[in-house]
Amino acid sequence: MLQNTSRFLARAGATVGVAAGLAFSLPADRDGAPGVTVTPATGLSNGQTVTVSATGLTPGTVYHVGQCAVVEPGVIGCDATTSTDVTADAAGKITAQLKVHSSFQAVVGANGTPWGTVNCKVVSCSAGLGSDSGEGAAQAITFA
């Protein structure tokens, strides 16, 4: 789990954070860029399971799926307790179940350094994915 968490933070955290900072809802566009959809994405309850679906991915590539937030300028904090790895199918698609939290203990960096508490009712949070090569996307999530 620690190895998966470290990979998630080192690769996906940055990817998810950058994607989240640029645009919270990134459907796949016509040139095949990765797109992600989170269902449901609004009015969530703490501990609820959402479905993260993505298209436009590199087939056979492992993607790290998780919940993150920008915790400081240029710093992404993620919930390492629920991150998971999923391999894109031959069509470049994935579907994963992800438990999300309205508040979580964020970790940052490849070593999973504790950062502190993230309250997704106060700051913007996202669910998304990223690969070791930095390919990924994210969508904003909100809690009731």
Swiss-Prot record:
A GO biological-process term: defense response to bacterium
GO molecular function: DNA binding
Keywords annotated in UniProt: Antibiotic, Antimicrobial, Disulfide bond, DNA-binding, Signal
The UniProt record lists the keyword DNA-binding: yes
Domain of life of the native organism: Bacteria
Disulfide bonds: 68-78, 120-125
Signal sequence coordinates: 1-32
One Pfam family matching this protein: Neocarzinostat
Biological role stated in the UniProt entry: Binds non-covalently to a chromophore which is the cytotoxic and mutagenic component of the antibiotic. The chromophore binds to DNA as a weak intercalator and causes single- and double-strand breaks.
Similarity comment: Belongs to the neocarzinostatin family.
Protein name (database record): Macromomycin
